[in-house]
Curated annotation (Swiss-Prot):
Plays a key role in the control of the eukaryotic cell cycle by modulating the centrosome cycle as well as mitotic onset; promotes G2-M transition via association with multiple interphase cyclins. During G2 and early mitosis, CDC25A/B/C-mediated dephosphorylation activates CDK1/cyclin complexes which phosphorylate several substrates that trigger at least centrosome separation, Golgi dynamics, nuclear envelope breakdown and chromosome condensation. It comes from Xenopus laevis (African clawed frog). The keyword ATP-binding applies. This is Cyclin-dependent kinase 1-A. It is an enzyme of class 2 (transferase).
Amino acid sequence: MDEYTKIEKIGEGTYGVVYKGRHKATGQVVAMKKIRLENEEEGVPSTAIREISLLKELQHPNIVCLLDVLMQDSRLYLIFEFLSMDLKKYLDSIPSGQYIDTMLVKSYLYQILQGIVFCHSRRVLHRDLKPQNLLIDSKGVIKLADFGLARAFGIPVRVYTHEVVTLWYRAPEVLLGSVRYSTPVDVWSIGTIFAEIATKKPLFHGDSEIDQLFRIFRALGTPNNEVWPEVESLQDYKNSFPKWKGGSLSANVKNIDKDGLDLLAKMLIYDPAKRISARKALLHPYFDDLDKSSLPDNQIRN
């Protein structure tokens, strides 16, 4: 830790306090995440250190770069590149009645998908995507933060400050207790974030797991084995769930054109096996008029 100076505390993350800091030798400004572990006495689990070390290899222009992993007094510090604004703060700063330009919505979604394709191709899931861990710079670049931390540390039910971890972006298979979920959980989250970037409002803002599920069911219809094979055998599925029919997404989501709504519907398909993959989503006609040459990484690398 001697190489870094703490400048100020900038927030509370899911796993602990986040500081703005500076690398003494180079002057580079960084974000320093102090990881607070459930069992402090036991120190940092070796599995967590292994997982985190792998994340240093995730180098992509749409992923916040993990620069360093440091230990001090059995505390783990993760050192990331610094970006001063997250998507949630940005959406909150837009004056009432105004919205993000439609081309920027498209560009942000495309970049988020590029970052996720890169990680999924390396078998890394995010599992906890939300506007707070999408960071933006002044040049229109958006980057995904906190990749792989869910696997390394688990997702706590409450954040360090006792705020409840948000359920708004969580895929229905996770909410229904599936243990065998995979990359489609991130695509669902990105779909809900897409709607929020366009409308400035969360698409499904439940305040408990059941409220979250019911908000999804009201909008999309209550799923059954016909639309989603084996959903009725998931741990938390109840035959007593109200049988909502579901309406059209366009009623809930203004500011997205026909192609955008088609892509959104494909990202919010109940059956994870039928949900569009991030790689296929990048090829959707919604992005046909996006100038990809100006994006930070328009080559999808395997």
